[in-house]
Amino acid sequence: MGKKRAPQKGKTVTKPQEIIVDESKLNWKPVDIPDTLDDFGGFYGLEEIDGVDVKVVDGKVTFVTKKDSKVLKDSNKEKVGDDQESVENESGSDSESELLEFKNLDDIKEGELSAASYSSSDEDEQGNIESSKLTDPSEDVDEDVLKENVFNKDINIDDISPVNLPEWTNLAPLSMTILQSLQNLNFLRPTEIQKKSIPVIMQGVDVMGKASTGSGKTLAYGIPIVEKLISNFSQKNKKPISLIFTPTRELAHQVTDHLKKICEPVLAKSQYSILSLTGGLSIQKQQRLLKYDNSGQIVIATPGRFLELLEKDNTLIKRFSKVDTLILDEADRLLQDGHFDEFEKIIKHLLVERRKNRENSEGSSKIWQTLIFSATFSIDLFDKLSSSRQVKDRRFKNNEDELNAVIQHLMSKIHFNSKPVIIDTNPESKVSSQIKESLIECPPLERDLYCYYFLTMFPGTTLIFCNAIDSVKKLTVYLNNLGIPAFQIHSSMTQKNRLKSLERFKQQSAKQKTINHSNPDSVQLSTVLIASDVAARGLDIPGVQHVIHYHLPRSTDIYIHRSGRTARAGCEGVSAMICSPQESMGPLRKLRKTLATKNSVSTDLNSRSTNRKPIKWQNTVPLLPIETDILSQLRERSRLAGELADHEIASNSLRKDDNWLKKAADELGIDVDSDEDDISKSNSDTFLLKNKNKKMQKTINKDKVKAMRATLNELLSVPIRKDRRQKYLTGGLVNLADNLVKKRGHNSIIGHEKTNALETLKKKKKRNN
C-alpha cells in the first residue's frame, strides 16, 4: 500500500483577477440570421460577446471579465480598485450554452443575398425559398469588430494620384479625395443640378433644388457635406455635420451607399462617420454605434427611427442640435399634410435645444443651413386623382411665381435662415424629357392580359407599380406561372426581405443583360419587379427600361416619381399606363390636365406671337399600338395563369388563417370544432365568413390544378406566330424560313420583327407630326 501524499503547505489557489470593462470597447461579434426565419423583428443587427459576465452593482449594470480574457486589448482594461466591491466569479465550470450564430443584415455584402426561385406569393413563402450559402462569419469578423481609436488615426488625404476633371475643378474647390472618387465612378462631368447647386451650397446659404428624376440630386447636396467631413477630419472634437431625412428606408440606404462611395479613403479609417439609421434594423446596435467618438458625423435617417433614438437618449438631442446642415431628400413627401408627424417633433426638439445653446453662447448665432430637394414642388400635385373635386385653378404667370408660393407653404413647416435660393433645372415640364409616356387602353378585367402582352412584345427590365399589396402578390405569382422571372416589394415585407428582393432583381437583370450582350441572338426575356409605391421615390435601380402603371397612381406626384425609375443618368425609358374606360373619364383626365398645366401656360404666352392653340390634354400621351392577333393567342394562357394564381394565394391565405385559429384555440384550451357552429351563427363574424367564402370559391381541387398546369405548360411550349401562320414559311410578306435560318426577327414571336417600345413610340410620334 502506498503512502498518501501529504498536502503541500503554503500554496493557495488564486482566482483570476477580474476587471470592469466598458461595453463600447468590447469586441462584439455579429450573429448570423438563418434564412429559415421569416421575421426576426428588431433583432436584425444583433451582436454577441463571449467570456463576459453582467453584474448589477448599486443599480448600475457593469460588464466584468477576467484579466487574461481576449475580449478586448490589454490597454483597454481597467483594474478593479481596492475600494471597489469585489466581484465573485460566478462563471464556474458550467459550460456556456451555445448561441445560434446569426449574421447582421448591415454586414451582408452585395452578391451575398440569395438568388431564390421566382415563385413567391407572399412574404412568408419567401422565407422558405432555398438560398445560397452565406460566407462564414468567422472569415470577416475583423471587418465588423469595433476597434478602439479608429477615428484618431491619421490618414494622408493628399496621398492620392491627381486626376484630370476640368469641369469639376472649375465648378468648386473640391478635394483630391472626391475628385479621385468621381473619376473612379466615371462621373466625368457634373449634371445641370450639380453645376448650379454645389457652388451655392458651399457658400452656406439655404437652397431649394428642383430637378427631374435621375438627374443626380443626391451628389448635388452630398458633395458639399462630404467636403466638410474631409476638412474636419483632423479635428479632435467633431460635431455633427449633416442630418439627412428620407421618406423611405430603401432611399436612406441608397443615399448612404452613394455618399460612402465618394469618400472611401476617409471611411477606410473612420467607417462609422457616415451612418444610416432606419427602422427594421436593430436599434440597440444603432445606439451603440452613436456612442463611439466621432461616429455619425453624417446621419441619413428616416424620421420615425431617429425620433425614437432621440426620445430614448436625451444626450442625442443636445448633440444633433449643433448640426451644420439639415437636408430633406424628397422633401415634398416628407412635408405633406398628414405624413411624417415625427419630422415636426424632431425639428421642435432640436430647435428648443439650439436656442438654449444660443442663450448660453454655446451655439452659433444662426440656425443650421437647410437644403430641400425633390423632383416635384407643386401644391397641385398632391391633390388626389380619385377626388371628385375639380382641379383648382392655380395658374401662375411664370414658374418662379409658382415656386415662391411653394416656399411660403414650406416655410410654415420648416425653418430657414433666410429666403432660400431657388434652383430649378426642369421648369418646362414635370416629367423628365427622357421618358416617353404611353397609354394602353384595356377592359377593366383584362389588366393582367395586357400586362403580359407588353412583357411578351417588349422584353427587357421592367418595373410594375400597383396601388394594392394584394395586386402585387397576385401579379407576381401570375407572371411566374407564365415563366417570366418576377420579384415583389411592398410595405408589408420585412426590411430583410425587401432588400433580398431588390438584390435578386438586380442580379437577374444583370445576368440577362450579360447574356444578351455576349450573344445578341439569344432569346431575350423580361425581368420584372412588381412594387407598391414604397419603391416609387428615389430608388436608383440601374437598367430599368420600362415602367408600367398597373393602376393609375392616386396623385400626380406619385406618377412623376414612379415614371422616374426609368430614364436615369441620361438614358431614355418608357412609362406606360394601363387604363380602363372608366378611369379615362376621371383620374386620367385629371392627371393629364395637371401635368399639362405648366406647359399650357408657356404655350399661352407664346401663342400670342405664333397664333398656335394650346395642346389638349388628350393629345399629350400617345396610345401604344396593340396587335389583336397576338393578343388573342395570349388570352388562354393568361386565363389559366390567373386562375392558378388566385388558387395559390387563396389556399395559402386559408392555410394561415386555420393555423392561426388552431394556435389561438390551443393556447386558450378551446375545442375549435365544437365552436364552429356558434361562430357561424354570430352576426359579428359575418364579414369574416364572407371573406372566407370568397377565398374558398377561388380554390381548385388538386386534380384540376394538375390538369390546368399541364395545359398551361403545353400552351407555353407552342411558339406564338404573327397572323397565326402555320404553313408555307416562305410565303407572305415576310419570309419566315429566311428569318429563322439567319436568326432575325422577334425572339418570342415567329414572323414578327424585333420590337422596341421606345423606338415604337418615337416612330408613332413622327407619323403624327
From Swiss-Prot:
EC number annotated for this UniProt entry: 3.6.4.13
Helicase ATP-binding domain segment(s): 198-395
Gene Ontology molecular-function annotations: ATP binding; ATP hydrolysis activity; RNA binding; RNA helicase activity
Domain of life: Eukaryota
A Pfam family matched in the record: Helicase_C
Signal peptide stretch: none
InterPro entries, per the entry: DEAD/DEAH_box_helicase_dom, DEAD_box_RNA_helicase, Helicase_ATP-bd, Helicase_C-like, P-loop_NTPase, RNA-helicase_DEAD-box_CS, RNA_helicase_DEAD_Q_motif
Annotated keywords: ATP-binding, Helicase, Hydrolase, Nucleotide-binding, Nucleus, Phosphoprotein, Ribosome biogenesis, RNA-binding, rRNA processing
GO cellular component: cytosol; nucleolus
Sites bearing Phosphoserine, chain numbering: 138, 674
Disulfide bonds: none
Basic and acidic residues bias spans: 73-82
Positions occupied by motif DEAD box: 329-332
Ranges where the record places region Disordered: 73-99, 114-140
Family: Belongs to the DEAD box helicase family. DDX24/MAK5 subfamily.
Domain remark in the UniProt entry: The Q motif is unique to and characteristic of the DEAD box family of RNA helicases and controls ATP binding and hydrolysis.
Protein name stated in the entry: ATP-dependent RNA helicase MAK5
Protein species of origin: Saccharomyces cerevisiae (strain YJM789)
Gene name as annotated: MAK5
